[in-house]
Amino acid sequence: MPVSGITSAVVDTSASVSGAYVGTSGWSYPSWRPDFYPVGTKPEDFLRHYAERFATVELNTTGYRLPREELFERWAEHTPPGFEFAPKLNAHRRSDFGTFSQRVALLGERLGPIRAVVAAARDEGLLTLLLGSFDPSVQLALDLRHESWDRIEADLPPNAVRVGSLEGEAPFRYLRLREPPYSDGELAAWADRIRSLLNERLRVYCYFMHEDEPTAPRYAERLLELLAR
C-alpha cells in the first residue's frame, strides 16, 4: 500500500545529493517484491538492484554473526563505486573487535561508518578499547543506549559520532529514523535538518527502518527528492 503523499515507484536518486547517504536498514527482503524489487528478481540479485537506487545500506547481520570473508568480498563486488555499507557491531563482544575490524576491511572502499551498539552503562575502558580497535580513518557511529552516556559528544575523537546527534567534531553525522509512518511534512522537516548539515560540508548518513512492506525505500527515495529541491 503506498504511503500517503509518497509514490510507490522508487527511482534512481542515489547520486542526486552530494554528501547525503540515504538508505534502509537492510535489503534482503522478499516481501519487497513487486513494489520495490521487480517480479522475478532472485534474492541473490536484491543487493545489485538496491545499489542501483541508493548509495548506502545498514549491514545488520554483522551484529549477530560475523559472515565469512567471501561474503564481504561478494557484497563489495555487487555494488558500484561510491556505495557504502554501514556494518553493525555489538560492543559487548569485546574479544571480537579485532576480527570484526579485519573482516569489514574486506569491503575496501565500500566500507562506510561502523555502527557500534553499546547497551551497557558508561564505561571509559570499553570506549577506549572500542575506539582503539579501528584505524582512525574508519568512521565510527556509536549507538549508546544508556542514559549515562549523555553529553559524550565532546569527548569523542574526530572519526566518531553518536548516533542521532547533530553535534560533534567529526565530518559526518549518522541518523536512524525508526518511528514510521512518516508524513510528507515530517520528511520535509528532516530534509531541512539534513540540508543544514550538508551546508556545513558534513556527510550525512540516514537510514529508515525495515518493514515487511517496502515503506523504507519509499521514504528514502522521497527524502532524497526533497533534499534535491
Where do the language-model regions lie?
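Residues lining hydrophobic/aromatic ligand-binding pockets adjacent to catalytic sites
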Residues: 1-229
